[in-house]
Structure formats: structure tokens, C-alpha cells
Amino acid sequence: MSKKRRKLNKDFEKKIYSSKKNVELVLAKIYDIDDEDIQKEYISAFNRVVYLFDELKENYELHGFSDNSKELLNNYENAFNLFESEFEI
């Protein structure tokens, strides 16, 4: 049985790459915080964003671009924006 080919989307790949860089930047800023309690609070709050990014990336790698891709990207972006609005980093 032949394997189904993933549908790719260059613009979507650029958004994933940009999202990855944003996650890495925020994590680096969080790890630079000296106060352990504040750092733990930020990490705890940012974990949801990281989880949603990982879900987005894995879904694209496994299934390619699909109807679900836009929803996953939207969920990630909303969580990232919410984190930025609630935490000054």
C-alpha cells in the first residue's frame, strides 16, 4: 500500500519557523531571569505556548498542511499573544 503524500505550504513553513524563533527567544529571556520564583512562574505560564507550538509543528511534519493546520496556528498565536499581554518579558 502506498503512503499518502503530505501537502506542503511554504508560507505556513515560514510561519512555523518564525514561531519557533519567537518561542526560543522568550525561553532565553525567561532563563535569564535571576529570581527563581519569578522564573518558575514565567515558565509555568509559557508551557502552554510551548505545548501548542510543538503540537502545531508535529502536526505539520506528520500530516502536512491541512484544514487543522490553520486552527493549530491560530491557537498557538492566541496563546502567545495572551502570554505577552499578561507577562512583561
List each model region and its residues:
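Amphipathic alpha-helical binding modules
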Residues: 65-89
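Acidic, low-complexity, intrinsically disordered interaction modules
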Residues: 37-73
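N-terminal acidic leader/helix
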Residues: 3-37
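Short acidic DE-rich linear segments
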Residues: 1-10, 82-89
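A structural signal for well-ordered alpha-helices, especially hydrophobic packing surfaces
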Residues: 23, 27, 34, 50-57, ...
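Amphipathic alpha-helix face/heptad-repeat signature
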Residues: 12-15, 19, 42-45, 72, ...
